[in-house]
């Protein structure tokens, strides 16, 4: 279970204070994947980072009663000076996992051939995103955190393998995905919420959340 209890979060932009959450309570139960609709500018990445423990709330408490992933696309745990192979082995050891398995899994999924043995500083943004996505799926978590869906890739084979693996995770774990596009959430979410004007409003279905989100977007 992941629980936000009376959590508030804001930061200073240089000209004004921007509020992300204002004294909000919600929880994510294991087995119930949550899709969060959030317009651009609501700083949804901060919300995901708080779930992962990368950022602290200003007030309130966040309880993590299970194993929660780093956010998809988070590169803070990898070193651009090292190769993907070296990074995969390093992260595996941090999680007390078999480095050879994690290395092989990431190499198979990303499939970037000789680049796998080159420093990640030489990678394109797309290659970095694919590697971090592979690394997240290589590790076993109870809750997977995704910001704006799967990484965009023109590689049809990668999209197929990654999509199948993510669906397998959805079937047996919990996904929390945040996006400004309702269609991004359709294949992942069993429940939904809207983050807007520092309020977190939960709904039983994505369609209910979409109706409120679309209506407020027109105001």
Language-model features: locations:
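A short, flexible loop at the N-terminus of ABC-type nucleotide-binding domains that lies
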Residues: 1-27, 33-35
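Conserved catalytic network of the ASCE P-loop NTPase/AAA+ motor domain
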Residues: 63-64, 137-138, 167-171
């Amino acid at each position: 279970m992941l629980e936000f209890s009376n959590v508030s979060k804001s930061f200073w932009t240089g000209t004004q204070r921007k509020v992300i959450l204002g004294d909000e309570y919600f929880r994510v139960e294991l087995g119930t994947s949550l899709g969060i609709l959030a317009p651009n500018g609501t700083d949804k990445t901060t919300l995901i980072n708080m779930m992962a423990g990368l950022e602290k709330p200003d007030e309130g408490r966040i309880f993590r009663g299970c194993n929660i992933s780093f956010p998809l696309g988070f590169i803070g745990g990898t070193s651009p000076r090292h190769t993907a192979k070296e990074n995969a082995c390093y992260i595996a050891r941090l999680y007390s996992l078999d480095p050879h398995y994690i290395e092989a899994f990431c190499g198979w999924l990303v499939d970037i051939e000789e680049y796998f043995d080159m420093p990640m500083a030489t990678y394109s943004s797309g290659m970095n995103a694919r590697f971090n996505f592979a690394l997240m799926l290589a590790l076993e978590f109870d809750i997977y955190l995704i910001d704006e869906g799967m990484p965009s890739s023109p590689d049809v084979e990668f999209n197929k393998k990654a999509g199948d693996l993510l669906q397998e995770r959805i079937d047996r774990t919990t996904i929390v995905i945040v996006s400004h596009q309702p269609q991004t959430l359709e294949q992942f979410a069993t429940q939904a919420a809207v983050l807007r004007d520092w309020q977190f409003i939960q709904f039983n279905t994505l369609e209910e959340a979409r109706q409120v989100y679309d209506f407020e977007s027109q105001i």
